[in-house]
Amino acid sequence: MDEKARLLRVRARLKRKKPKFLRQEWWRFPKFKNDPKWRRPKGIDSKMRLKKKGKPRSPSIGWSSPRAVRGLHPSGYEEVLVHNVKELEAIDPTRQAARIARTVGARKREAIIARAKELGIKVLNAR
């Protein structure tokens, strides 16, 4: 657990420095501003593809987080999406935490939270 906590701190530090990777010339076109996602530059004269100074950064393997903590919640738990009380039974409370699905209503949400408390499972989005 000690090593995992250290790697989570390393990941948080790396994420603070990591830029948002947006597609080339996203600022010029409204259709790109409203849909910010990465697309690889493929133009033959593209300065971004050639990694010129002053141009936006491109994703590369060096920006990734440590493999042991990749995809984990900042608390260190692996997230498991839960739709009902029965799905809580499959969760390992030592390394997994529940996230209640957005389609779950108030009554079932209360039941899930109550059962999770009995089982000692952390609920990430318990209001």
Swiss-Prot record:
One of its GO terms (biological process) is translation. GO terms for molecular function: structural constituent of ribosome. Keywords: Ribonucleoprotein, Ribosomal protein. One of its GO terms (cellular component) is cytosolic large ribosomal subunit. InterPro entries: Ribosomal_eL32, Ribosomal_eL32_arc, Ribosomal_eL32_CS, Ribosomal_eL32_sf. Residues 38-66 are annotated as: Disordered. Residues 38-48 have a biased composition (Basic and acidic residues). The keyword Ribosomal protein applies. Belongs to the eukaryotic ribosomal protein eL32 family. This is Large ribosomal subunit protein eL32. It comes from Thermococcus gammatolerans (strain DSM 15229 / JCM 11827 / EJ3).
